[in-house]
Amino acid sequence: MQKADFIDRIVIYVKGGKGGDGSASFRHEKYVPKGGPDGGDGGNGGYVFLKANPNLSTLLSVSEKKKYIAENGENGKGKKMHGRNGKDVVIDVPVGTVVKDFETGEIIADLDKPGMVVCVARGGKGGRGNVHFKSSTMRAPKISERGFEGEERKLVLELKLLADVGLVGYPNVGKSSFISKISNARPKIANYPFTTTIPNLGVVTVNELQFVVADIPGLIKGASKGAGLGNVFLRHVERCSVIAHIVDISGMEGRDPVQDYFDIRNELEHFSSELAQKEEIIIANKIDLISKEELEKRLEKLRKETGKQIFPTSIITGEGIEKIVYKLAEIVKESKKFHTQSEVVNEQIKRPKPLWKELPERFNIEIIKEGNDFIVTGTYVEEWAKRLNLNQKDGYRKFMELLEKNGLEKKLKEAGIKDGDTVWVAQRAFEYKE
């Protein structure tokens, strides 16, 4: 048994892989002196997915990394060989995780069933190889496209926690002490009624199993009708696997543990018949405060009157705690197995189209003048510069033709350019000549 940090809200960065670049290769084969273009397309970038895993109860494992980046697509190759697609990243999150966009707050997904999958970052599409650019006027195109960048965003993951174990019992029977002993929860503990005013949630790890324990506060006689605080908090345990009912077996406060049990049991039945039918164990706390003879008498009476399995313990000394935790883990594991089989959504990972943007051949050009320097800019100027490989002869030529077609010369003259001034295009400098 180990204690697990409880984390229910995190921010992560996700990015799809970049598409691979297309190839600008040519056939080089014996007896084929003028082999044509044979450059293959780049592979698509990998995607990032979130998947609801019923075996997780906290976002701790996800929070250990801040960035999740899928693999880039492989570049295209000769012989019309496509590059390999980048590997996806699949992030397991607990069932009940709500996914929001960090910037807008928009809810992207509510992963409320085991096995649900959502794509949160698409990979970029691979660039085209030079086989796509062959034409009657360009028989040997030395041009290819660069792959498109993958989608990137920041996400907020929030966990709507569903308790696996609901702790019930009168105030001061030791619920808060018990949950702090077995988990990471650290409730304020004092000896007066209604000490706990919000549900304390703790995460316990037993071997590979994580489960959530909720300490339901203020549950007293009349709670189902709104007395105390119980009516508000009973909802937190409606979907739990097991009710752990803690009683003060010592009776030090003058109450009868058997009567206490039936009082609380009655409230559960009034609130929800479904809740009342859940598996239940009774934890008889404060065994260190009475003699062994008196303890045996009281335990026997409790067993006989309730017909339930009784687990004697002293939360203060720790006696009997481990046995209780392993019993709870056994019940939760069986319940999870049943619910997972009945509720699981066997979703195949659906891959939307990779990220890609068709660029128009007609667009606006802007000129920024800084002394004798004239910087050519504009949204599509930048995007075409990224799309085409300007180190390739025909790629550079196509880029300059696009600029000329969209009035580069006219724009420069309107900006007051003179012979000998410097023109900057895509981080390259040229001397302007009339």
From Swiss-Prot:
Domain OCT: 355-434
Keywords: Cytoplasm, GTP-binding, Hydrolase, Magnesium, Metal-binding, Nucleotide-binding
Domain Obg: 4-162
EC category: hydrolase
Tree of life domain: Bacteria
Alphabetized SUPFAM superfamilies for the sequence: Obg GTP-binding protein C-terminal domain (SSF102741), Obg GTP-binding protein N-terminal domain (SSF82051), P-loop containing nucleoside triphosphate hydrolases (SSF52540)
Name of the coding gene: obg
Chain residues that bind GTP: 169-176, 194-198, 215-218, 285-288, 314-316
Domain OBG-type G: 163-333
Function: An essential GTPase which binds GTP, GDP and possibly (p)ppGpp with moderate affinity, with high nucleotide exchange rates and a fairly low GTP hydrolysis rate. Plays a role in control of the cell cycle, stress response, ribosome biogenesis and in those bacteria that undergo differentiation, in morphogenesis control.
InterPro entries linked to this entry: G_OBG (IPR031167), GTP-bd (IPR006073), GTP-bd_Obg/CgtA (IPR014100), GTP-bd_prot_GTP1/OBG_C_sf (IPR036346), GTP1-OBG_CS (IPR006074), GTP1_OBG_dom (IPR006169), GTP1_OBG_dom_sf (IPR036726), OBG_GTPase (IPR045086)
Gene Ontology biological process terms from the UniProt entry: ribosome biogenesis
Name of the protein described by the UniProt record: GTPase Obg
Gene Ontology cellular component list: cytoplasm
